[in-house]
Amino acid sequence: MAAAKIETAAEIAAHGAPPPAPVQTQSYRESRPQIVGPESPQPPFPIHLSGLVQRGFGRGGKDLGCPTANLPDESISPLSSVARTGVYYGYAQVIPPAGEDRPLLEDEVKVLPMVMSLGWNPFYHNERLTAEIHIMHAFKSDFYGFELRAVVLGYIRPELDYVSREALIADIETDKSVALNSLKRPDYQKFAVDSHFQLS
């Protein structure tokens, strides 16, 4: 019997309201792997994204301790057109505009590990599809309007709903750990110097 086709995020968005997401359970949390994906990225990965950072909902840093950078709708179509909703991992880089009077520090313009949520964030009942990227670095200031480039290398887990904010935060922390572990493999590390990025 053929496996059921998994709808892409763009296909779900075309239907209107997304279907209800499954609720995360204790057994799911305890059974999560610490490394995901094959030994090297497989199609449709790598997926290259870029766009100017937009203001989002402002809750990633405030509510969850996980500040995110939002890409405009047109910038996420290379991913949403081929991938399901859920959490992904890879690398990202923030590039300041020429002459910007809000300069980033030297270690803030490097290519850095990231995790990304693609979906509707059911815990917050979003009404539209978004891609929210968390770069694993403590930036000293915001970078709205700066260019963000990302290379998406793999899938971590499906989009879930949560019984509490604490359960969501715990899963986010696990996502970050899984991403870092998964990116340690040689065939993933080489994408930190991908030609998509601005390398000195």
Predicted regions: what is each one?
Residues 2-200:
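Phosphate/ribose-recognition catalytic cores of enzymes acting on nucleotide-derived substrates
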